[in-house]
Amino acid sequence: MLQENGVTEWSPLFSEPHPSREFCVQYGETDYDFLCRMAAEEGIFFYEEHAYKSTDQSLVLCDTVRHLPESFEIPWNPNTRTEVSTLCISQFRYSAQIRPSSVVTKDYTFKRPGWAGRFDQEGQHQDYQRTQYEVYDYPGRFKGAHGQNFARWQMDGWRNNAEVARGTSRSPEIWPGRRIALTGHPQANLNREWQVVASDLHGEQPQAVPGRRGSGTTLDNHFAVIPADRTWRPQPLLKPLVDGPQSAVVTGPAGEEIFCDEHGRVRVKFNWDRYNPSNQDSSCWIRVAQAWAGTGFGNLAIPRVGQEVIVDFLNGDPDQPIIMGRTYHHENRTPGSLPGTKTQMTIRSKTYKGSGFNELKFDDATGKEQVYIHAQKNMNTEVLNNRTTDVINNHAETIGNNQMIAVTNNQIQTVGVNQIETVGSNQIIKVGSVQVETIGLVRALTVGVAYQTTVGGIMNTSVALMQSSQIGLHKSLRVGLGYDVKVGNNVTFTVGKTKKDDTGQTAIYSAGEHLELCCGKARLVLTKDGQIFLNGTKIHLQGKEQVNGDSLLINWNCAASKSPPKTPDEKQDTPDMREY
């Protein structure tokens, strides 16, 4: 900035560190005012250094009186009329005044929220005044231990005129940046070293004006000095304040959509900025206010490159911007189409470097109220305890590919009326222990091709009333060991054509009262009293080897034979299940 204003020769004489600042704005102030304010904040004073044997001069920036040139002596002589050949001081008035006695400066930094951020500085050389005049400065505009220097420099600045002497001399060598040693003053305590802090030269040369006469060339130097055992520093200057929020555009590297640091801060380009390009270096990192911010919880939405944001300033300080909100404009349009979608409240994101989005939408249109959730790819829901879903009317769920449900303990499913379950291909049900199925009235099972039941151990079927089984073609029954059938009343077998019983070793047919074998007009009847009746139109007995018969009495063709008894009546109390 000095070079831009034609100051090509300048030198810094610093004894203390003056670190660079993260962000510093010249706002609403001239270059000179900006440099003076910065110098005051850093405890720096400046003066011009003149060469004694040439016209060269340079600007010196200094932060301690120790770097000033050695002092030169100059006597006190109030009677300048009697002695004009020797440069002296003709007037010298010393004054002391009450100034602030201490400075307390405080600030806050979000990077160290628990840090006290406070520094105290007591003033020096206060023997003549009370020490109760404190200056409290917040914000102190520091972020670390450098704030102690800020407090000390500010204290020196507030007290830069606590002890001051003003004088008059004809010497042109008394100028700011030099030290003088006053001698010969009747007040002995004033004969000491002084630092020159101000100088106002006034000269006259009346004989150089045609038609005028005078007593010759005169030069008066009205100056101000302070004791040289302390460093003069400028008083703190008021910093320009920003009147209100401003709009800016979020910036970042070329091709990047989201550009932030570990704190979620972004960079912006202000609309008034004529110098910085719209890239990753357009501003400092700027914090973003969120709707909710807690320790590991809250709301987080990073402004994206190209979005318009509203920037406010903490305490109106242009060096401390903070983004308070975001706004739409003609190119960045809102979700939906206003005013048609004015009843909708929408939270819609955008896929990073893509065209997709995630969305949560609330529609408050009367009679069409709706909550809409859109997940561009995956959606995960985690519930650490209970979850309850209550649908008053209908619930439809469509899954394009696979569904997996894992229940660690129990699952209870209740259907009030009907349930229809359709499986397009295969269904496999595995029960680790016990399966119980209860049907109140009727169960119908239709299998298109094959039906197989495999039981590893025991299978019991219990039917309270009736059971009917119909096979269209063929039924096969295989029992590995024993097969028992118990019927409480009647058993009827009806075979349309042929029935064949094949027993590998022994077949026993037993009836408690009546055993009968019939075929047309032929009958074989066995009764419980031991009678056997064989009746038919013709009876043929053939024994290839023998036909044996033993009895006490054998009657042939003597009308002694009896007709077999009639078949007992069957009590038909079981319905024919074929009708069902």
What residue ranges belong to the model's regions?
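Intrinsic-disorder/coil detector with helix-boundary
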Residues: 58-59, 68-72, 505-507, 512-580
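Short, conserved helix/loop micro-motifs enriched in His/Cys and acidic residues
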Residues: 9-23, 281-291
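Extended, domain-scale alpha-helical bundle/helix-rich regions
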Residues: 3-9, 16, 24-228
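Structural signature for extended repeat/solenoid scaffolds and their inter-repeat hinge/linker regions
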Residues: 44, 61-64, 243-535, 540-542
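A generic local secondary-structure boundary/capping motif
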Residues: 90-95, 213, 237-239, 256-257, ...
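Acidic, low-complexity/disordered segments
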Residues: 187-248, 324-330, 334-345, 562-565, ...
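Extended boundary segments
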Residues: 111-143, 231-274, 344
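Short helix/loop capping segments that flank catalytic or ligand/cofactor-binding pockets
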Residues: 47, 69-72, 100-107, 113-119, ...
